[in-house]
């Protein structure tokens, strides 16, 4: 089963890159990002199989300062899967039948609309399908995440913010694909800040470089210190206020505070290793904050560390989709000096 799923996931990644087009005779997809239509018999949905599906896909997103699920789920019985729903961006068809010889999932792309993914998950018994989800549920969910990521990346390639992309290329020697709407807010030799402003929210990112002095330069402590140095160039709403990294949170056991350190892991994207940090930003001297994710790697051509740091401010609204679309930026980054 694990071998099947690994082959399946690789195939999904390859096919999804090729299948997400933005000019076709097919109709456009409907639905919001990170929304999945699950077509499943009511009896299955109300039982342990439906419970397992909901637990997997509605797992809370980590490292955002409110509870939001990984995906928003719309359940439809097969008889109601009509009208506009076959054009939805993300569809999971759940089929339990004694005629199924194996428990498996397979993906199809652009079946009715594009860029669309339709996954059929089938098995001979409820028990077999629940066991499959317990073992492979996160990988199954990852297939839909890859599809959402590819839509963002390919959309930015097709309808990019060309002027800002060229500015970044000249300044940092990297190619990046940005959806239109971002405005450059500040820039100097080693720093660039851009944001996309909404009436009640903001998506922003800043890129910065600094010298690499060995492994001590990429410890979490060193990366946070560098982040604070450059984030201080992003002003807050009141005079003298500026962005910084949250470093303490209330202690639930008493009235004091405890140290908070961003989560860290190394990820490999497009052949390049990046140190990913996830945490929260706040404003020194004012009351603002939200989640951030940063990616740092070594530019071997310059022997400097380069960081793409993404943040969201949405005090009254959801943050998941805003942050996810920023995370997808890293998948469109390549170094012009390393080609």
Please identify what each model-predicted range represents:
Residues 1-8:
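Bacterial N-terminal signal peptides that target proteins for export
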Residues 16-19:
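C-terminal motif of bacterial Sec signal peptides marking the signal peptidase cleavage site
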Residues 22, 39-41, 179-246, 251-254:
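Secretory pathway targeting signatures of secreted, lumenal, and periplasmic proteins
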Residues 26-40, 95-162:
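Solvent-exposed alpha-helical segments and adjacent loops
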Residues 29-31, 39, 43-46, 55, ...:
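N-terminal "mature-domain start" segment
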Residues 69-128, 235-302:
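Signature of long, low-cysteine stretches enriched in small and polar/charged residues
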Residues 117-128, 204-210, 304-313:
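Short, well-ordered beta-strand elements
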